[in-house]
């Protein structure tokens, strides 16, 4: 393989056991907190599989592992909130990706429940912004489900804060160039 006149490494893996996780660790992504349910049924998880699908009408796509506690609540409730995390919220991202993540009524210690235009939206103080979404469709993706969410509410967050980014297995902020 030639790239810009130089020889590139050709360690090509073509087996079905391709380590997709190793590949995806190289792709920097933003980090979000997904919440769903209320009261004792409330559940949350850290998420970085988030895609903007359309602007009109506003829709997002998320990927949720079927074996997660949050998946069962999410598919039963049919709605969710997404909060984009700021750079200083790395400890929260780690907490909500752990097995000991808070749920039920304890989730109220971290997020504020708002009802805007008749829709619930959990807002994480200090986050970049929040969305309240209704599940419009669920697509089977083997060990995950892809959920298409119709955005019903947007709540602005911390003005001027930098995003939390996940890259190479680490959480951090961004560096601006130029």
Name these PLM-found stretches.
Residues 2-178:
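Basic, polyanion-binding surface patches
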